[in-house]
């Protein structure tokens, strides 16, 4: 059975998240329906990341098995036709080895969080960025963010319902960049805890407002106490931007799209 790797982008606003849920619209659900629509097969669409309700993606990766040997461009175009009118697009399809797994073969996941730092409401970026009206010091946020890099117990930034076996994660990147009113927070790690990125962003906002120092953020991390976390940032600003795989597998959703 041929195995295909799909690179997917989507607007998460109308969905109850990635994972199939009974009687709720999900990204995985509409992708599975699209596969069945053109192939007649009940294929499992296995994703690299289980994004929450309202979270977007520019570089989600999934894999599927199909009984028939289709050309990758045929799979892409057929899924495009069957995904309409949902705000989901399969932007690339590749044939991959049978042991490729979108989730377990991944060596790094890259997330982007978008903030628009202005008082006026958002007309074009509504539901696609977090509008923060109070002035933020992005430079202070970036300096503080570096205190979270490396291997730590991230219990402070972990959702109560997180099912991960351990709260320890290794954070490889957490950069805060400003251009005009736009603030972009880019973070990378092999994997993240449930709500970890949004929790870190919410805490960095306190630094940007001048309410916390870099030491305060480091102390919150060291406390390993969810009650020490800042307010969790909303889902609308978060994007799964890219997923990286070992060198023998082409990197998908290249970070230059972030």
From Swiss-Prot:
This protein's UniProt keywords: Isomerase, tRNA processing
Organism domain of life: Bacteria
Any single biological process term in GO: tRNA pseudouridine synthesis
Subunit structure: Homodimer.
Name assigned to this protein: tRNA pseudouridine synthase A
Signal peptide as annotated in the record: none
Pfam families, per the entry: PseudoU_synth_1
NCBIfam families: hisT_truA
Principal EC category: isomerase
Residues annotated to bind substrate: 111
UniProt-recorded Gene Ontology molecular function terms: RNA binding; tRNA pseudouridine(38-40) synthase activity
Function: Formation of pseudouridine at positions 38, 39 and 40 in the anticodon stem and loop of transfer RNAs.
Active site (record annotation): 52 (nucleophile)
Reaction it catalyzes: uridine(38/39/40) in tRNA = pseudouridine(38/39/40) in tRNA
Documented EC number(s): 5.4.99.12
Lineage of the species this protein comes from: Bacteria, Pseudomonadati, Pseudomonadota, Alphaproteobacteria, Hyphomicrobiales
